[in-house]
A protein has these predicted regions:
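RNase H-like nuclease fold core
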Residues: 1-44, 48, 54-62, 134, ...
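RNase H catalytic domain
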Residues: 7-17, 51-127, 131, 140, ...
Length: 154
């Protein structure tokens, strides 16, 4: 089975309130995911959007195309940076907690991550942006515990 995933992350300030949005499409079906956080960064929300979409899957071994406007996510995976970071135990790298979570999920499937221009003519990316910004602006915000612990420890 093949699956298409569109993702986006948003933050109101960097750091600040943030949110992610994801849309999964398969076999004529569609599922939307989103959530907002009290204090986070845009890159954490971009990566968390991908993670939450992959965590929503109930099967392994899928062919997945992910579309995101995050050069951070695309380059880290498609240029192989994240695998080098992993070999060095993510020493000095931001968002190590999320990258480790991502890699556990990534290895369960055949995934290709594609870049799309944000805030442009890609209707699905625009929908994900709407989901992410609505979540960031909602009154029901979650705590990004790892980020907040690091932020307040500074």
């Amino acid at each position: 089975m093949s699956l298409i995933i569109y993702t986006d992350g948003a933050s109101r300030g960097n750091p600040g309130r943030g949110g992610y949005g994801a849309i999964l499409q398969w076999g004529g079906k569609e599922k939307e995911l989103s959530a907002g956080y009290k204090l986070t960064t845009n890159n954490r929300m971009e990566l968390l959007a991908v993670i939450k979409a992959l965590e929503a899957l109930t099967r392994e071994g899928l062919d997945i195309q992910i579309f995101t406007d995050s050069e951070y996510v695309v380059n880290a995976v498609e240029k192989g940076w994240v695998f080098g970071w992993e070999k060095k135990n993510f020493a000095g790298k931001k968002n190590a907690d999320l990258w480790q979570r991502f890699l556990r999920l990534y290895r369960k499937h055949r995934i290709r991550i594609n870049w799309v221009k944000g805030h442009a003519s890609n209707a699905m990316n625009n929908r994900c942006d709407m989901l992410a910004t609505r979540a960031a602006d909602s009154g029901n915000l979650l705590t990004d515990e790892v980020y907040e612990a690091e932020y307040y420890a500074q």
